[in-house]
A protein has these predicted regions:
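Bacterial N-terminal signal peptides that target proteins for export
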Residues: 1-12
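Surface-exposed, glycine-biased beta-strand/turn segments
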Residues: 34-127, 175-178, 187, 212, ...
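Beta-sheet ligand-binding and adhesion/scaffold domains
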Residues: 314-380
Length: 380
């Protein structure tokens, strides 16, 4: 949810399959970065080492896999799981013997909504793996007393997704035993994981919030993978959304969907910082039904309002071509997508592309496809 400046936001309308949800998190800058394990903590000695579910299994409605799309605050595939609760609030406990290293409170204002405070908690079960919980609605009494006041290191407020956020964080060193109370959820809980032994590929690593850190965006992992059986299997059975289960490997989802020299993956408004994600574009696949292609559109294309636009991709041709096969520079591809839209797409170079929405209808004859002055370019 947060380290060195990624903020959580309670937003709605998650997922390209169209379910309106209370999606959580961020819209700030990058994922968990800049944090390291406490001194003296041993490296991870087994593949699975978490022995207790974060929340009772029966309190989980479903878990949205990695790679959720919810523009504009989450224009890019998200780097965390969303636990959606079957109850209004649920107790959160330590999933194993852990050391908490940071606690953050985030103040949300504006957007025509009541002001909201929620918390993130970062911990290490062993030195190789960092886990962070976002949207903790309230800290447990005993845990809060150990942490103390959260009014010291406060960042400047910043806007994203129609809200204004301010974060205040505190470095701590609090050991907890498996099952010890951390706090309670609201309707959702964000669960991030970073594993310094894992390396994921990005088309432009310079665009990462932390290109070199042991627990930055190069090291995104799935927290469920660290739970022992049968807990891990039970949690995996919840991966999906209401009415749909993710069955395509990797069932925990996929964050890094960049394919070099193709249209697939993350694209940036030229000259804009990586975060917030609002002005950017992702050409990806749905995190629950990955057979669906998705245009995840931020705020920079006047002809395509910020939203997700889905289509059934094909491996050849010039209509609805899977982004991973859009590799010919200068060739225009047409897409008939959801929300009664057509989209034109063209690779201008290996690191630059052009996009425009052209309204309803069939794609028709490629000889008629042409961009107007309203087309927008993005870069890797």
């Amino acid at each position: 949810m947060v380290p060195r400046s990624k903020a959580p936001a309670l937003v709605v309308a998650c997922g390209a399959i169209g379910l309106a949800l209370g999606c959580g998190n961020h819209g700030g800058n990058g994922g968990p970065t800049g944090l390291g394990p406490p001194g003296g903590l041993a490296n991870c000695s087994a593949p699975q080492f978490l022995t207790t579910s974060l929340v009772l299994f029966e309190n989980i409605r479903f878990i949205s896999p990695l790679g959720n799309l919810n523009p504009p605050p989450h224009t890019f595939p998200t780097d965390h799981l969303y636990f959606y609760m079957a109850v209004a609030t649920a107790a959160i406990v330590a999933p194993g013997d852990i050391v908490v290293t940071e606690v953050l409170v985030q103040h949300r204002t504006g957007g025509g909504q009541p002001d909201l405070d929620d918390y993130s908690v970062t911990f290490f079960p062993c030195a190789d793996v960092m886990i962070q919980l976002g949207h903790v609605a309230r800290l447990g009494t005993q845990f809060s007393a150990k942490v103390g006041a959260l009014d010291g290191e406060c960042a400047a407020p910043y806007p994203t997704g129609g809200f204004t956020y301010q974060q205040c964080r505190k470095s701590v060193n609090v050991s907890m035993a498996a099952g010890e109370a951390i706090g309670v959820t609201g309707g959702t809980l964000d669960v991030f994981a970073r594993d310094r032994r894992v390396n994921v590929s990005w088309a432009n690593p310079a665009r990462l919030s932390d290109a070199v850190g042991d627990f930055g965006d190069r090291h995104v992992a799935c927290a469920i993978d660290y739970f022992v059986a049968p807990i891990g299997d039970q949690l995996r059975s919840k991966l999906g959304t209401q009415g749909a289960v993710r069955s395509t490997p990797p069932v925990c989802g996929d964050v890094a969907q960049d394919v070099v020299n193709t249209a697939a993956g993350r694209w940036f408004q030229p000259g804009s910082p990586t975060y917030p994600e609002d002005p950017h574009l992702a050409l990806a696949h749905d995190n629950v039904v990955p057979s669906l292609g998705v245009f995840s559109v931020g705020t920079s294309i006047p002809s395509l309002p910020a939203n997700v636009y889905t289509f059934p991709p094909v491996p050849i041709g010039r209509t609805n071509l899977d982004f991973r096969y859009v590799a010919t520079v200068g060739e225009i591809i047409c897409y008939t997508v959801s929300r009664n839209q057509r989209v034109l797409l063209q690779l201008v170079s290996a690191v630059r592309l052009k996009v425009e929405g052209i309204g309803p209808g069939a794609c028709g004859d490629p000889g008629t496809w042409a961009f107007s002055a309203g087309a927008v370019e993005f870069e890797r």
